[in-house]
């Protein structure tokens, strides 16, 4: 899919929620997974780049997404929202279950083209952020790192924060790094360019 205009990004809907591979859609549409810590702004990212207010439900309570949520975009592409990691109020067994579900999807889904790994630009990546990035690199899954909440930092400090994030991740410069803000609508075009390059 070389041209963005062939995709009507506003024609989007939630397709289904899945707990395991028996529930995944049975076709060959390309999929982009979205991964990140609870409350990093995954739902806001989805809503913003699709130009929709409440397609992905945002929540002030982290850990709301407990299944893989598949979003259909113009019958040409899917986003797959995976459960947010690193939320302390979820039991260890529940976290292990989520981890297994995410790992099964990421390592066995032929439709998967890339993962948008969301991190918070304001802070150094967490241990879980680093583990996720390392996991994706190990399995040779293309990664698009999107650093959210840029509006909370003065623009003059973005480069410094970007350097901190990249250093902690041991960022591979062949991957894409995007500074993003759903509030100020920064990084939308760059995100689409990176996504469409993979599908």
Swiss-Prot record:
SUPFAM superfamilies: P-loop containing nucleoside triphosphate hydrolases. One of its GO terms (cellular component) is cytosol. Mg(2+) binds at residues 43, 65. Belongs to the TRAFAC class TrmE-Era-EngA-EngB-Septin-like GTPase superfamily. EngB GTPase family. The keyword Oxidoreductase does not apply. It comes from Streptococcus pyogenes serotype M28 (strain MGAS6180). Necessary for normal cell division and for the maintenance of normal septation. GO terms for molecular function: GTP binding; metal ion binding. Its cofactor is Mg(2+). Residues 28-199 form the EngB-type G domain. This is Probable GTP-binding protein EngB. One of its GO terms (biological process) is division septum assembly. Keywords: Cell cycle, Cell division, GTP-binding, Magnesium, Metal-binding, Nucleotide-binding, Septation. InterPro entries: G_ENGB_dom (IPR030393), GTP-bd (IPR006073), GTP-bd_ribosome_bio_YsxC (IPR019987), P-loop_NTPase (IPR027417), Small_GTP-bd (IPR005225).
